[in-house]
Amino acid sequence: MLLFPSTSLRLFFFLFLLFSSCFLQIRGDDDDDDISDDNIKVDPSLKFENPSLRQAYIALQSWKQAIFSDPFNFTANWNGSDVCSYNGIFCAPSPSSPKTRVVAGIDLNHADMAGYLPRELGLLTDLALFHLNSNRFCGEVPLTFKHMKLLFELDLSNNRFVGKFPNVVLSLPSLKFLDLRYNEFEGSIPSKLFDKELDAIFLNHNRFMFGIPENMGNSPVSALVLADNDLGGCIPGSIGLMGKTLNEIILSNDNLTGCLPPQIGNLKNVTVFDISFNRLSGPLPSSIGNMKSLEQLNVANNRFTGVIPSSICQLSNLENFTYSSNFFTGDAPRCVALLGDNVVVNGSMNCIDGKEDQRSSKECSSPASRSVDCSKFGCNNFFSPPPPSFKMSPTVRVLPPPPPSSKMSPTFRATPPPPSSKMSPSFRATPPPPSSKMSPSFRATPPPPSSKMSPSVKAYPPPPPPPEYEPSPPPPSSEMSPSVRAYPPPPPLSPPPPSPPPPYIYSSPPPPSPSPPPPYIYSSPPPVVNCPPTTQSPPPPKYEQTPSPREYYPSPSPPYYQYTSSPPPPTYYATQSPPPPPPPTYYAVQSPPPPPPVYYPPVTASPPPPPVYYTPVIQSPPPPPVYYSPVTQSPPPPPPVYYPPVTQSPPPSPVYYPPVTQSPPPPPVYYLPVTQSPPPPSPVYYPPVAKSPPPPSPVYYPPVTQSPPPPSTPVEYHPPASPNQSPPPEYQSPPPKGCNDSPSNDHHYQTPTPPSLPPPYYEDTPLPPIRGVSYASPPPPSIPYY
């Protein structure tokens, strides 16, 4: 009689203890930002080259225990003291001690791993590049990341991270590239983010709310993508302060209200301006005609009224003007002539007399079609009374989003399900993985292409032939290496190499999808089961014994970002997505591929010339590219990472660390190619400290001095053979919060021997492109541009 209740109580008590311990472990990670290796046992028989590699061993072994699923056995060779030979791990000479090798880069893109980030990763204090896009990592970003003082690029896109904005990234002094796309971050965007010297910010496809901070104009970024959130509120008038650096901005599908601030006319370097799928109203400011570099203008699916200003149609560089699904009543004769000027124009579903495909007379006489008084919105964007022709409509005044104290509904938008899982209906559904089905949703984005592609980096001046690193064997080249934004090095003091390498296209890996979506389709990669859904990013690099960097093939649908002088912002050119309400067009942003060798710039510092960016016009200090070589079936040693010599002459393929003090380089100019072509391997550059010719595809660690990074050339690195495997440390980090994956839930393939299956080979697996941005970062879902 008492047996049944007793059994039930025991089961309940056991489950309670299990979840309580997991929660306490997660909270412990959040509250404790200090790291201690006292509880981690290292086999005394293991011999390490230096204390830094011993610390890296502890960090990586702790991380290996925190990975619940590794379907491609990517961590099969994560054994022994030769951490530089681990799959996805890349070493380089330390900037402070050229004879000392340290772990300078991690590239696990497209590894499809499930797990969390243990706080021991903070022991990787020499890390400059950290690329994890297109996996199933969940939980929160550990506070111990604050110890990564040299971290230059952080790409966590297309995973299942949760919680509020990871404020720890605001404490990273060398950070230039931040990509948090396709996760489940929520709450407000901190205003301090726009006070940092960043070059690219990608926050699209999350759950951010409570408006865009008023100090947005303080940011020196060249690429800013906040699309597909639920921000609400007005576009800050401070946007006009970004005219010197901003090249591309995507604010589509953010529930924005109010009128378009006339200060946008100061954005003279912007090539892509996308504010589609919002609730913006009023007239289009004639100041748009001052945006001389504008190529893509998308204001579709809003509530704009009045007449199209003739100044817009006189822009000499305009290639695509989409103003459909508004309430415009007329357009200037010059705009009619655009149809014969090889300019794509879409003005359907408006109230323009004499045109086809317009709204009905009933819709055009509705309250939504009436002109409004922009000064009544309280956006503080207008300093003079509106033109007399515009009267305030009787519609209810739109107020900015509620304060952060209000709760955010977790069902607003469903993130893409893992490749094997189906997506449940939600208000905003992102494209499911190639194998998963997309459930109906209010806002559906096109599924990512079925094939995987690794990001490519735009070509920079050819670096001198990479010197061989005698101590270690050549690093394996990874097939799908994380894309890295290559920043143009300063003008070389010595003659450049005889011929430049093919241009590196900086593209983020797009999620796989059955076929390339139509042009400009903004789709998010599907997440994997368990943790928060994530979109797929570029596949992890396949390691081959060739030291040369792997080639990156952009996803068929999402456009890739080409980098010229500085990391290009993602261009979101998306083909039109199938969702009932067409999602905003995005310009696919591809994350920079990981460079196999990492180079550190010479100790001497010299300011590099300002980079010029074409295509996605993103002006900001270019991040150093890192090269990741493909991996062969057997775990090959990582590619060599080199730090540039202390002398002012350009060191061969050194890895540069960006200067500790943040000095923004001149705004880069990006060209955003609409067509997708396989980009060459992208190098990872660390900004050099000394004056020297910029090498092509080297990895730069920001120099300790405040001078801009110098160019570096890639060096062929031959990593030493990995020693016998030793048991990993017995310490096991607690799982992170918000992570549903467990060893029992996800398939975890344990390989008893190192000769386990090599990482899968991904061919052109694109992430959903972000329409309108051509920045090299983890591949976003591709969406056709309207």
From Swiss-Prot:
Induction: By ethylene. The gene is LRX2. Disruption phenotype: No visible effect. Enhances LRX1 disruption phenotype when associated with LRX1 disruption; frequent rupture of root hairs soon after their initiation. Keywords: Cell wall, Cell wall biogenesis/degradation, Developmental protein, Glycoprotein, Hydroxylation, Leucine-rich repeat, Repeat, Secreted, Signal. GO terms for cellular component: extracellular region. Modulates cell morphogenesis by regulating cell wall formation and assembly, and/or growth polarization. Together with LRX2, component of the extracellular mechanism regulating root hair morphogenesis and elongation. Hydroxylated on proline residues in the S-P-P-P-P repeat. O-glycosylated on hydroxyprolines. Its main location: secreted. GO terms for biological process: cell wall organization. Residues 384-786 are annotated as: Contains the Ser-Pro(4) repeats. LRR repeats lie at residues 100-124, 125-147, 149-172, 173-196, 198-219, 221-243, 244-267, 268-291, 292-315. Mostly expressed in roots, also present in stems at low levels. In roots, confined to differentiation zones, the collet, and meristematic cells of tips. Residues 1-28 form the signal peptide. The lineage of its organism: Eukaryota, Viridiplantae, Streptophyta, Embryophyta, Tracheophyta. It is found in: Secreted, Cell wall. Residues 460-477, 487-542, 566-589, 694-713, 720-737, 752-769, 777-786 have a biased composition (Pro residues). This is Leucine-rich repeat extensin-like protein 2.
